[in-house]
């Protein structure tokens, strides 16, 4: 610092002009502070996995492709792992730091002793009851078979809650067939092949088949019947959250900015769909943008209603777990982010 001041003194005629000297000294100190801050925000590596590649996952891809993770000081390794159970195992085992899975998967794992917690969400799943075109009404589903991914999947729990509201009793009026298939697009293929009669799917699934000229019977809507299922929640181990709050806070900021970038810019959204899902049809991109990007929550707090229903459903299927007295979410970081005004800033 002394040499810098001496150099400036010689250039300012013996120090007679103090205002430029003070100004330049202030700029120098600001530069030092900026460099120090940029070093501080280099938070290191974060390993993130998602259980299924769908249009709802776009915000993670957008954050990756547009260097939003780097913007907040993170070097992110983003990987796809097929299936919620396997993805959860990688988190619990320590190979992955953060995962994107259904809330039901996280709650079930926590109920069985896994030290995991939900810290954010991407919103609700817009489940529809999809049937073969020959089935025109709910009454025609009686005696038929509905395909599910597995007996612990979010579609299974949604159906058990939804069917009685539609006048159908599981096990009596309809039966379930475990397909082992997570993708609703693939399950609908089983419907069209006549191997099952109906399944749950999304608005995206309906649009995809209709654009191919294949009609489906949409018999009911889950949300319209008061059934709320998260499309995907952000989950971390409690110990990792405790030891790495700065990393997770930076991740959440990148995630939130990715969501808002998707909302505002359909071209950015479409670019990641082309890269990760091989979707080229702009008509489908337009539908998926409306169904997913525009549906991202403005503040991604875990959905209390979805979690409440998931707990009730899991307890009904696994009464030994007794989940009611447990805490499955931690919103401390999101509350910090909101208190700092980040939501307001990013939405401008």
Which functions belong to the PLM regions below?
Residues 311-348:
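Conserved C-terminal helix/tail region of periplasmic/extracytoplasmic solute-binding proteins
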Residues 11-24:
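Bacterial N-terminal signal peptides that target proteins for export
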Residues 34-38:
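Sec/Tat signal peptide C-region and signal peptidase I cleavage site
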Residues 39-183, 187-193, 197-203, 218-222, ...:
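Short, glycine-/small- and polar/acidic-enriched structural segments
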Residues 22-32:
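Bacterial N-terminal signal peptides
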Residues 103-105, 176-177, 183-277:
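Pocket-lining segment of extracytoplasmic ligand-binding domains
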Residues 242-323:
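Secondary-structure end/capping motifs
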């Amino acid at each position: 610092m002394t040499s810098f001041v001496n150099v400036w003194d010689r250039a300012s005629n013996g120090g007679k002009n103090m205002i430029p000297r003070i100004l330049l000294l202030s700029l120098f100190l600001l530069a030092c502070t900026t460099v120090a801050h940029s070093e501080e925000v280099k938070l290191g590596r974060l390993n993130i996995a998602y259980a299924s590649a769908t249009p709802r996952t776009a915000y993670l891809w957008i954050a990756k492709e547009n260097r939003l993770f780097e913007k907040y000081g993170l070097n992110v390794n983003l990987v796809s792992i097929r299936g919620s159970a396997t993805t959860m195992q990688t988190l619990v085992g320590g190979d992955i730091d953060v995962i994107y899975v259904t809330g039901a998967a996280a709650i079930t794992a926590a109920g069985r002793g896994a030290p995991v917690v939900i810290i954010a969400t991407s919103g609700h799943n817009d489940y529809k009851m999809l049937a073969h075109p020959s089935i025109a009404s709910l009454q025609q589903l009686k005696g038929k078979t509905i395909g599910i991914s597995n007996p612990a999947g979010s579609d299974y729990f949604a159906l058990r809650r939804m069917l009685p509201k539609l006048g159908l009793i599981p096990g009596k009026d309809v039966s379930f067939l475990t397909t082992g298939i997570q993708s609703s697009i693939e399950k609908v293929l089983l419907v069209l092949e006549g191997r099952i009669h109906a399944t749950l799917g999304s608005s995206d699934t309906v649009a995809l088949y209709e654009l191919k000229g294949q009609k489906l019977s949409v018999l009911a809507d889950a949300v319209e019947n008061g059934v709320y299922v998260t499309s995907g929640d952000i989950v971390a181990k409690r110990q990792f959250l405790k030891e790495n709050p700065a990393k997770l806070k930076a991740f959440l900021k990148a995630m939130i900015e990715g969501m808002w970038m998707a909302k505002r810019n359909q071209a950015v959204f479409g670019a990641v769909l082309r890269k990760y899902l091989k979707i080229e049809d702009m008509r489908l991109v337009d539908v998926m943008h409306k169904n997913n990007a525009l549906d991202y929550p403005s503040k991604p707090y875990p959905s209390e209603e979805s979690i409440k229903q998931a707990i009730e459903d899991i307890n009904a299927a696994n009464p030994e777990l007794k989940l009611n007295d447990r805490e499955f979410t931690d919103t401390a970081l999101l509350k910090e982010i909101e208190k700092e005004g980040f939501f307001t800033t990013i939405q401008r």
